Amino acid sequence: MFVIIGYIVCFGCIFGVYVLHGGNVQVILKALPFEIVTIMGGALGAFVVNNQPKVLKATMAAIPMALKGSKYTKERYMELMAMLYDILQKARKEGLMAIEKDVEAPHESEIFKKYPTVGSDHHVIEFTTDYLRMMVSGNLNSHEIESLMDNEIETHHQEAHAPVAALARLAGALPAFGIIAAVLGVVNTMGSVGQPPSVLGGMIGSALVGTFLGILLAYGVVEPLGGLVEQKTEDAAKELQCIKSTLLASMQGYNPATAIEFGRKVLFSSVRPTFTELEGHVKGKK
C-alpha cells in the first residue's frame, strides 16, 4: 500500500508541476512508447547479461515480496518465541532425546503444529531443527554451533542481497540508456534539419524525453524498490538471529523463559514485544 502511495506522490508531483508550468504532456506521451522500449529493452538486456540465472530468479521473486506488507510483525515474533519456548521446555523437562521426533518430523510435531505462521515457513523450521538436531546429538559445543550459525546466516545474507545489488546496478544503468535514447533522437532530428522550427522543436523535445525517463525510472522507481528489498532482507536475517540467540542461551544453561529473552532482545524495537506481552503470549499457548 505504501509503495503505491509513494509512486503516486512521486509521479504526481513531477508531472503535476510540469503541467502547472504549462508543459505539454502530449510531447511526453507521443515519445513515451518508443523511449520506453529503447530504455527498458536495453537496460533489461544488460540486466540479463549482468546476472546469473539464480540471481535473476531471486530478483523476480524478491520484487513481488517487497510490494507486499511485511510479514515480520510483533505477532509473528511472539509466535516464534513461544514455539522455541515450548520445544526447549520439553527438552528441559524430558531430556533432549524427547524432542528427537519433533526435530526429525517437524510437520508431524504437535509443538510445531501449534504455531502455523512460523511452522509453515520452511526457512525457519529448517534453521531451527538443524541446530536442535545438533544439540540432541551432543557432538558440538555452543561455540562450535555458534560459528556454524554465523556462517549460515552470512550465506543467507549474501544470497538475499544479490537481488539488492542487481537492482542497484539496473538503477545505475537506466540514466545511461536514457542518454542513448536521447542521442538517437538527436541523430534522427539532425536528419530532418530541413523541417520547419516547430517540427524540429517537437523532435528535440521528444529526444530529451529519453534522458528524462531514464533518470526518472532509475531514481523514482528502481532504486527505491531496491532499498525496500534490502530492508525486507534485513528483517529476514533478524528472525534467524533471534532463533540463534535463543538456542545458544539454552545451550549455555539458561532456562527456556530466560533463553527467549535473549532472542527478544535482538529484535528491532518497532516489532519487539515487551517482556509482559511475550510472557502473556507464552502462558496463553500452554
What do the predicted segments below correspond to?
Residues 1, 71, 220-221:
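N-terminal start-of-chain detector that recognizes signal peptides
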Residues 5-8, 12-27, 148, 152-231:
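Helix-termination/interfacial motifs at the ends of transmembrane alpha-helices
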Residues 19-161, 236-286:
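Large intracellular
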Residues 2-9, 34-38:
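Alpha-helical transmembrane segments of integral membrane proteins
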